[in-house]
Amino acid sequence: MKLSIFAAIFMAFVSLNQVFGSMTHSVKSKEAIISADESLVKPIDAGQAQPEGCPVCARLGVLCPYHYRADS
């Protein structure tokens, strides 16, 4: 009985070790790592004018909670 409990715990440990070992191996491999030189998002042009008016304020007809707090 004690041997079967030990065998079950040992098999669970080996299985988890194989799963996590394969995950860390794929993370460490060069194919899985994204180069820092590559752009992941488009840059935002800060020179563009922001749209005037808040769509929430326009829809409600009153100041939204965000702008109400900003004015007071």
From Swiss-Prot:
Induction of its expression: Expression is induced during host infection.
Signal peptide segment: 1-21
Keyword Signal on entry: yes
Main subcellular localisation: secreted
Alphabetically ordered keywords of this record: Host cytoplasm, Host nucleus, Secreted, Signal, Virulence
Cellular component GO terms, alphabetical: extracellular region; host cell; host cell cytoplasm; host cell nucleus
Keyword Transmembrane helix: no
Annotated localization: Secreted; Host cell; Host cytoplasm; Host nucleus
Function (record text): Rust effector delivered into infected tissues to modulate host functions and contribute to pathogen virulence. Enhances leaf colonization by the bacteria Pseudomonas syringae and the oomycete Hyaloperonospora arabidopsidis pathogens in an Arabidopsis thaliana infection model.
Protein family (similarity comment): Belongs to the CPGH1 family.
Official protein name in the record: Candidate secreted effector protein MPL124499
Organism: Melampsora larici-populina (strain 98AG31 / pathotype 3-4-7) (Poplar leaf rust fungus)
Source taxonomy: Eukaryota, Fungi, Dikarya, Basidiomycota, Pucciniomycotina
